[in-house]
Amino acid sequence: MLSRITRSSKALNFALGTTAVAAAGYLYAQSRGNLSTSLNKGDVTGQAAAQTFTGDGQWHALKIAKIEQVSHDTRRFTFALPSQDHVTGLTTASALLAKYVTPKGSNVIRPYTPVSDNMARGMFQLVIKHYDGGKFTTHLFGLKENDTVEFKGPIQKWRWDPNMFDSIVLMGAGTGITPLFQMMHHIAENPTDNTKVHLLYGNKTPQDILLRKELEELASKYPDQVKVTYFVDKPEGDYKGEKGFITKDFLKQNLPTPGSNSHIFVCGPPPFMDAFSGNKVSPSDQGQVTGVLSELGYTKDHVYKF
């Protein structure tokens, strides 16, 4: 097991690695590294931030500020909030609903989890994979910078409280990484949260590993708290990680026991969910845990499905 770092030492490292500002909340926001690259000194002030999404059901048309190609079928979209003093208003773990109206007047709505810091001012980022035949992703990938997309929310998934578990395991595949990364990033960068985090992340090839740089930066920055294990079906080049799929034997050897103060969070495409935990019955009904995790003795008391 990874050695447990103390709350005081983590807080000290956090303080040494950031620039002092007037309010502790903005000190926390300033420490985010890569995910806050679009912020500048004028974005982090003593002025209270305005929340964009308050759960009032209102749709907000937001401009695409930047589009970056992440892989052959995935892009990172940066959206501008109403002003540089606005934050999303999201908490961990929560998502937004995105909408577009078809030429025939019907609404196409999809949920997306931002990968940028919840405290980032003036912007938020989504990492989105294009799916053949996907109505929303096809529309989105046809847009350009300065085009707009409508959003509303937040949609609360799991309400995270610091130190609610001694450790958690995040199991994901493909774009299922986004809510898992949101949790990992939030926990690791919070100086008062000592929760151990182990990410198990499966993909077809090393090139398909989304947010790889950000994941490895967190693991490097917090080696006593964050561990990342990749699983790749078709390893290439200098890839260092597990080969093939996440196996039952690996889980048996590496997961905390069902009775421990820990929790497992799972997110991925339907076949991945079917294999390990079973899919949700509905957005509000987690259903029973099935698949490999059930075979290992885990129940809905130990597992959450995004």
Curated annotation (Swiss-Prot):
Could you tell me one molecular function GO term of this UniProt entry?
NADH dehydrogenase activity
Keywords assigned = FAD, Flavoprotein, Membrane, Mitochondrion, Mitochondrion outer membrane, NAD, Oxidoreductase, Transmembrane, Transmembrane helix
Which cofactor is essential here? FAD
What are the EC numbers?
A: 1.6.2.2
Q: Which residues bind FAD?
A: 164-199
Database matches in Pfam families: FAD_binding_6, NAD_binding_1
* Enzyme class, spelled out: oxidoreductase
Residue spans crossing the bilayer: 12-29
- What GO biological process, any one, is recorded here? ergosterol biosynthetic process
The main location class comes to mitochondrion
**Topologically, how does it sit relative to the membrane?**
Single-pass membrane protein
Spell out the family assignment given in the record's similarity comment. Answer: Belongs to the flavoprotein pyridine nucleotide cytochrome reductase family.
Q: What is this protein called?
A: NADH-cytochrome b5 reductase 2
Upper lineage ranks?
Answer: Eukaryota, Fungi, Dikarya, Ascomycota, Saccharomycotina
